[in-house]
Amino acid sequence: MKLLKPTWVNHNGKPIFSVDIHPDGTKFATGGQGQDSGKVVIWNMSPVLQEDDEKDENIPKMLCQMDNHLACVNCVRWSNSGMYLASGGDDKLIMVWKRATYIGPSTVFGSSGKLANVEQWRCVSILRSHSGDVMDVAWSPHDAWLASCSVDNTVVIWNAVKFPEILATLRGHSGLVKGLTWDPVGKYIASQADDRSLKVWRTLDWQLETSITKPFDECGGTTHVLRLSWSPDGHYLVSAHAMNNSGPTAQIIEREGWKTNMDFVGHRKAVTVVKFNPKIFKKKQKNGSSTKPSCPYCCCAVGSKDRSLSVWLTCLKRPLVVIHELFDKSIMDISWTLNGLGILVCSMDGSVAFLDFSQDELGDPLSEEEKSRIHQSTYGKSLAIMTEAQLSTAVIENPEMLKYQRRQQQQQLDQKNATTRETSSASSVTGVVNGESLEDIRKNLLKKQVETRTADGRRRITPLCIAQLDTGDFSTAFFNSIPLSSSLAGTMLSSPSGQQLLPLDSSTPSFGASKPCTEPVAATSARPTGESVSKDSMNATSTPAASSPSVLTTPSKIEPMKAFDSRFTERSKATPGAPSLTSVIPTAVERLKEQNLVKELRSRELESSSDSDEKVHLAKPSSLSKRKLELEVETVEKKKKGRPRKDSRLLPMSLSVQSPAALSTEKEAMCLSAPALALKLPIPGPQRAFTLQVSSDPSMYIEVENEVTTVGGIRLSRLKCNREGKEWETVLSSRVLTAAGSCDVVCVACEKRMLSVFSTCGRRLLPPILLPSPISTLHCTGPYVMALTAAATLSVWDVHRQVVVVKEESLHSILSGSDMTVSQILLTQHGIPVMNLSDGKAYCFNPSLSTWNLVSDKQDSLAQCADFRNSLPSQDAMLCSGPLAIIQGRTSNSGRQAARLFSVPHVVQQETTLAYLENQVAAALTLQSSHEYRHWLLLYARYLVNEGFEYRLREICKDLLGPVHCSTGSQWESTVVGLRKRELLKELLPVIGQNLRFQRLFTECQEQLDILRDK
């Protein structure tokens, strides 16, 4: 054995409370007290192991120093993969660190340039839950969980896959919890506290397995820490600071029955730390000796307040070695090297010691295969870690389930290979740019600073920012919901490169996440992801959502009509006996202002309507003044016969102003009985002529000419329709105020509240419909005709079936605010009217329930906090367009989401995500949008699978499956919005098959579908 105390490992005379060696053995970390804060230092292991490296000045001894903790650091622990370092301190925080590959060293802050950080480590997550000092942290096998204990008497289990999610808070101790340890087979976690107890908790349900108190009855809270340890074979748990006949011991607790019949004795003061060697040993065979197999044994190091260290072998009754007065103060922590032959010990006196053993002294270490066989023979399975998405001990009972699991593993392997290629490509690019190294570029930048001289001759130098270039593997955020799959754990164990598959600090879309199964999501407005863009996107004239490429395309086009601006609605109080405002005759100056306003609005409309190839047509009829009197302005000349010009065919019909002839009809409407606060919508006035292009059929044009003089002197209005060169025309006795068309019908609204409907060949389908009040907006989609009147009543008819869909429904219930206006109108292909209001809310009318339903809200906090990027199957699946996507108009709310998710607890985020996805499914169902319903249902089910919500998932499967056997009394419907429910269930099965936890549900649904198929 060799003993070394490297004096250069220190915290400037301050105490060192913790030490831990990196799994690859190249570095080690110390944690303790700094000058004015807690200090975490990462040291090079090579100068400790090799004397030549210690003397070589070119080999750095200190790699990095982090002073982020506000108070003393009590514990530092490397993850088993070596990718992360966790530190806990008196500031009640746990910080998780990850290396950042910077170019070149940097100096330690406050060291006046004397200390340099060779490696750069950044804090990727700060875990806040404890209300007192954090005394110990411990990573579980395979890094699935991180446990922390505190003087607040609790143990917190963190989900290391999705920081900062808390899986459980273990409450049961009545004193300061000062030590933690996981058993090597992942079934228990043990904690020791000042309440004179050691408690063992089950990881299956995070409940108490046993509480051991007898060996600690005589103990007092005299130690700073109580670091207990579990043997690598899982047979023994050794505690710190127990008492036997008033003498300090380290109590040995047998896993079988939790018996306390043995202990390590000999120390004169309380035991502070116990640490088992990670290796299992067997006796070294000497030359010529018998080949009889030896019994495996373990090695354990014990540190005490008496400043001595003892090393024990479980095959010996006495310690292998005892070193007295190794330090000036109490021993605080112990760490073994991964090969099991070296040990680092730290003390409160601020120094560390390294002991180097030989195989002749300890024995031959067993291989990992032999160690795994010992676990299997004793416990059946090794490392039986159970998380939400990984059940290593579960047996796959269904061949279809096995097929899905293998497919998922192959996809993860492909993603890993692609990521490896991208990383190698990026490293080659960042290392050399155009044949010049980054270091040379950095030096040349100093020579290229910009220098100018002012008029008075003084020099002005523009400084250049020469920042460190980070080439590390950085993710965008720390929130994600990627479950740790069974194949993922195996990959992490098999190769170091698999470490990148553990997304500790990766985010998570609603919506591109750095996870194995999700590609970066493109920003396209055709994607109904619940994300949001700027407020102007909702009111844009063009709608990119309709023209974006999509895998889940809708067979029919939606025709939203952006019909109202901020001056849409007017509220007036009816004053009995007072003269009507409509009787006021405007002056010539006012008439001129009206004409100028018309010209200005027309020019704006022409500029905003330049794209004639949109799938979604938005028409914006504007009320030209807040005055109720609107005069006719002769601004549109009589159109020539034949095909209209391009600029005229795009001219919105809604730019007309009201004529004096229409005042009588408006006055008639205002004379109707109304409440004290009446809602009045603008009325379009007749034009001499106008042309309208039908948005659903670009080859279809509607031309209207009012007051056409005939031979008898009778004035008529002419309606023309041109479709693919085929033209028809008809005449009407009243002047046409507005017109609309679709691929199925053409309708016009005339004076005297008349609405006429024609087929696309010019045949009148219905006698003129008398509207309850003058028309305000007219719109057609397919066979559906929607009329919105000046009295704010809405009607929708199916003219082919000649039935009413919505009958004179009032908008008063949704326009409740004094300044509320309608900013956009939609009529879906199923005749569902949708109103977008100025406050960002959108309501659709449900004909079945005769209610207005809220389907979108731009200020919805659920959409801002929802995070379901882990549930996105692919980039293409997000390109789902439809009425819901057009209404919501969201493509990316990552900015608002990122700002909120850092302050939103994961439990709240999980609940808001569920609520948001359920709202999306319900909204798509109400809008009868089959493609969007399928999209959001699959997304919702995938999130339930990832988060482990079995009850809700089972309810969905039950509804989609329906009764297996025929029943006359069953009310179950086999379709939903035109989709067969059992076909949807078949699409859900591969999603359910990704989580072994739901294999029973998968098998049940699969078997019942097979029974139905055989029938």
From Swiss-Prot:
Q: Which residues carry this modification: Phosphoserine?
A: S111, S548, S556, S583, S608, S609, S610, S612, S659, S673
Q: Name one GO cellular component term.
A: chromatin
Q: Where is the composition biased (Basic and acidic residues)?
A: 603-617
* Segments of this protein annotated with the region Interaction with histone H4: 736-1015
Region named Required for repression of histone gene transcription: 439-475
Give the compositionally biased regions (Low complexity).
494-507, 540-556
InterPro entries cross-referenced by the UniProt entry = CAF1B_HIR1_beta-prop, HIR1-like, HIRA-like_C, WD40/YVTN_repeat-like_dom_sf, WD40_repeat_dom_sf, WD40_rpt
- What does the UniProt record tell us about how this protein is modified after translation? Sumoylated.
Record keyword Ubl conjugation present: yes
Region of interest: Interaction with ASF1A: 421-479
Q: Where is this region: Disordered?
A: 408-431, 494-558, 603-623
Entry's Gene Ontology BP terms: DNA-templated transcription; gastrulation; muscle cell differentiation; nucleosome assembly; osteoblast differentiation; regulation of DNA-templated transcription
Instruction: List, alphabetically, the SMART domains matched.
Output: WD40
Keyword Repressor appears in the UniProt entry: yes
Q: Can you say where in the cell this protein is located?
A: Nucleus; Nucleus, PML body
Molecular function (GO) terms for this protein are:
histone binding; histone chaperone activity; RNA polymerase II-specific DNA-binding transcription factor binding
Q: Please indicate which superkingdom the organism of origin belongs to.
A: Eukaryota
Share what the entry says about its subunit structure, partners included: Interacts with CCNA1, HIRIP3 and NFU1/HIRIP5. Part of a complex which includes ASF1A, CABIN1, histone H3.3, histone H4 and UBN1. Interacts with histone H2B, histone H3-3B, PAX3 and PAX7.
The record's family statement is:
Belongs to the WD repeat HIR1 family.
Record-given protein name: Protein HIRA
Lineage of origin? Eukaryota, Metazoa, Chordata, Craniata, Vertebrata
Question: Source gene?
Answer: Hira
